[in-house]
Amino acid sequence: MAGAEWKSLEECLEKHLPLPDLQEVKRVLYGKELRKLDLPREAFEAASREDFELQGYAFEAAEEQLRRPRIVHVGLVQNRIPLPANAPVAEQVSALHRRIKAIVEVAAMCGVNIICFQEAWTMPFAFCTREKLPWTEFAESAEDGPTTRFCQKLAKNHDMVVVSPILERDSEHGDVLWNTAVVISNSGAVLGKTRKNHIPRVGDFNESTYYMEGNLGHPVFQTQFGRIAVNICYGRHHPLNWLMYSINGAEIIFNPSATIGALSESLWPIEARNAAIANHCFTCAINRVGTEHFPNEFTSGDGKKAHQDFGYFYGSSYVAAPDSSRTPGLSRSRDGLLVAKLDLNLCQQVNDVWNFKMTGRYEMYARELAEAVKSNYSPTIVKE
């Protein structure tokens, strides 16, 4: 399996394909070619100083007579943990806060309106270990924990909606842990939260040792810049999960994730892009970067030898549009900020062309699914 030595699919294609072939391959892989954003020089200089990649692309819609363009700039942040996983908890959280603050400041230079961080961004992705301490100490209140207060300041200072995925401790309901994304308005107020609907039980993804499936449904958040939803990590494998956010009105669905190359890298470029097409919305897939080493060996009942790391988190964050176009991915090996300029009018324009909502036959599937979940259900199989 390729680790950090392989930088990106795009770099590989550009290195080995002649230009005419490259253009055709990119047309198939990424849809229509997107215009690169002319981001401020000082933003690139700051990104260079802070050692993270900066890219920007624009998705454009057709000009309309009655509606003005509905422009929003989104920012996707991918990063590695700056300190070893065995560093003191408070030091790790502080280091991650500092790292994210530096990246958000560059996002503000680029005019970003909505920014989203990776899944469980304030900690190592330690759920592979099945150990409780010290990892549960990273859990915080979604409403007024230190990370939420930190993000509220960022949001207010930069007039930016912040999507902050954390490990939540719900003190109002028995100190239960949840995998949660907090949505903070550009006013600095906590707009609400959403929880991970689907919890993996595959390989080293031992997450159900810590938290279970979310209980908040599929909320969509009305922000000044558009309607957004957050489909956390493993939920991207479930088409109905994307569908319900779309049915509830989401125009942009963020997918903050933590996933490794051995398991999912061949799925990664497809799933969020397919969801954007199927649901007439923009999708934003975000993954962390690097290999995280833990103090103690662990196993996962899959026959593999005991080991001390989860695997390689391959980054490659990207944005996909309802017309099937998508940005190139960020690096597989570096921290990065991807800025995308979206015209939300494209959602309705594509809907009018393909009519997936109109032709979806939801009433038929609702009826059949209602029968399928009954204990006495028999599949409809026609036999001779």
From Swiss-Prot:
Regulation: Strongly inhibited by 50 mM Zn(2+). Not inhibited by EDTA. Competitively inhibited by beta-alanine, 5-aminolevulinic acid (ALA), beta-aminoisobutyrate and 4-ureidobutyrate.
Active site location: 119, 196, 233
Coiled coil: none
Record-listed Phosphoserine modification sites: 378
Domain of life: Eukaryota
GO molecular function: beta-ureidopropionase activity; protein homodimerization activity
EC number: 3.5.1.6
Cited Gene3D superfamilies: Carbon-nitrogen hydrolase
Effect the entry attributes to changing residue 233 to A: Loss of catalytic activity
Broadest EC class assigned to this enzyme: hydrolase
Quaternary organization: Homodimer, homotetramer, homooctamer; can also form higher homooligomers.
The family this protein is said to belong to: Belongs to the carbon-nitrogen hydrolase superfamily. BUP family.
Name the record gives this protein: Beta-ureidopropionase
Organism (species): Homo sapiens (Human)
Taxonomy of the source species: Eukaryota, Metazoa, Chordata, Craniata, Vertebrata
